[in-house]
Amino acid sequence: MPNFCNPIAFRLLSATNPYIMKKLLFVFAICLSITTQAQKAAKPAVAALPFDTSITAELKFRNIGPWRGGRSTAVVGDLQNDQLFYFGSTGGGVWKTNDGGSNWKNISDGYFGGSVGSIAVSKSDPSIIYAGMGENTMRGNVSEGFGMWKSENGGRSWKNVGLNDTRHIMRIVIHPKDENVIYVAALGHLFGPNAERGVFRSKNGGQSWEKILYVNDQVGACDLVIDPTDPNILLATFWNVKRTPFSLESGGPGSGIYKTIDGGNNWTNITKNKGLPQDTLGIIGITISASNPEIYYAIIESKTGGIFKSIDAGKTWTKTSDDSNQRQRAWYFSKIFCDPKNENVVYVLNVEFWKSTDGAKTFKSISTPHGDHHDLWIDPNNPQRMIIGDDGGAQTSFDGGYNWSTYHNQPTAQIYRVSTDNAVPYRIYGAQQDNTSLRIRHRSRGGQIDDNDWEPTAGFESGFIVASPINSEIVYGGNYSGFIGCINHKTGDARNITVWPNDPLGQGEGTQAYRYQWTFPLLFSPHKPRR
């Protein structure tokens, strides 16, 4: 087809067929107009105005809280100073206290990321600390990490010592008499296979590593303990686990318990030993009694799982309890510990903090400042001294868990979303994982912002929070499972405005009209603020 906007084609057509001359003139006029407009549009854009960076050079970030802790899955204490403890946060790095938990200070900022899976202090030289990166609670919103880090001066400085592709380091064990010998239990990639997983050992303080126990590229190590009386004996547990953005597959071939009696040179799979579950196994937590090293305890995820005890160093086992209180959400918990002075005192971490005094047959809940417990360290010389890690951070106790330090002194909160309103002064909104939603004015009359300036608002731990553009006292907030709430801060009225009003917790997906992600967006139209 001829190009009617081409002058040569125009002349040829008009010469051979004068009848269409007038129509071609009209078409040519339109084409000329379009071409002219295109040429105008093709002019070079106006250069962007330069931004004077000196305007913002003096601006600095400041911490406005909240000061209550976020989730901690790694805790440890110093054996030479009973006031010295450390914890690793899933979003705030490594923290240290020199006064028994009254005050905490971050000691890892500027070195590595915030997600810590394990932390260990050398018994022979407590100035040496190892931190393993990558959260060890395998949530859908889990944060991975970047290998092993070492401090040789009590946390004043750090250096990376490898294992960077392990992603999730579950446990670090340091030889009690030789700080250069370190063992690491690494889970590996959670969302896919990889080779850098299993149990690793270093004999030169982290300068090099050898993989001493490996199952396959889909099974990783999830717990590791050393015999307090014989450092050549270690127990390791392995877990076949995989996450997708919408599911968790826990359990499968390769999950089990392994034992070495020569410091990790050779391992024996003891999973088939008498008394242990023989169906599909998931996550396994394990511990060795320091007062009687022939006694092992294990908490095992399986259809016939529960808490198991061995009195002959793992040769045979007996189920002592299948109480669901200690087994719920096994993939999130499954940690077990034995009192170093009493073989019959056993602690199990779950939503509540459970204690047994009869060899894990029965348990009693011990009150703690927060719920969802993930790690515990007990002083081997003084079992009354301990530190626990939970969804509220870390707390210390000097009386065996009857009294605990506060967690309102460690700003490690994981905040999902941040928004502001149109008030004067404007307020800042956010939802804190494992806690509540919050709002605060960006400045206070007292010259500083502290915990007293925060207040709860609509929604809960995982949602978007938005204030009405018309009335900032009316706030809307979301939460997991599709919950949406509204609160009027002026009147105190609150209501549920969830799209589908049925409570979805505990129901199958087939009963749900809609499905929601853990956190889903809420927003107002910038054009029609009532929408």
Language-model features, listed with the residues they occupy:
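Beta-propeller blade termini and top-face loops
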Residues: Q39-R531
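Bacterial Sec-dependent N-terminal signal peptides
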Residues: M1-A42
